[in-house]
UniProtKB/Swiss-Prot annotation:
UniProt entry tagged with the keyword Membrane: yes
Organism: Xenopus tropicalis (Western clawed frog)
Keywords associated with the record: Endoplasmic reticulum, Membrane, Transmembrane, Transmembrane helix
UniProt-recorded name of the protein: ER membrane protein complex subunit 6
Subcellular location per the Swiss-Prot or TrEMBL entry: Endoplasmic reticulum membrane
One GO CC annotation: endoplasmic reticulum membrane
Subunit and interaction comment: Component of the ER membrane protein complex (EMC).
Superkingdom, natural source: Eukaryota
Length: 110
């Protein structure tokens, strides 16, 4: 029975540096998608409620892609799934509005 490995039961040890690194990657992804979707909304000329709906759709799509990428072993990379869905959502909204209004003004106003 030398080929059978015993599965160790017990507490999981989590590296705090790895958790912070993963949070930084999530923040970078959320900021990048917010900037790109804001620029897209501005170029497309979306206004008012349609622009905000576009942001939340883009944010939901990013969250879905992050969940699919992390797979069933999400607990290997994160303490909970909540940061995948809500992490950086409000900060990303500010970035989105900045790019949205700037590109809308450059393309449709001037």
């Amino acid at each position: 029975m030398a080929g059978v490995a015993l599965k160790r039961e017990g507490p999981q040890f989590i590296s705090e540096a790895a958790v912070r690194g993963n949070a930084a990657v999530l923040d970078y992804c959320r900021t990048s998608v917010s900037a790109l979707s804001g620029a897209t909304a501005g170029i497309l000329g979306l206004t008012a409620l349609y622009g905000f709906i576009f942001y939340f759709l883009a944010s939901f799509l990013l969250s879905l892609l992050l969940v699919l990428k992390s797979g069933r072993k999400w607990n290997k990379y994160f303490k909970s799934r909540k940061p995948l869905f809500t992490g950086g959502l409000i900060g990303g909204l500010f970035t989105y509005v900045l790019f949205w209004t700037f590109l809308y003004g450059m393309v449709h106003v001037y």
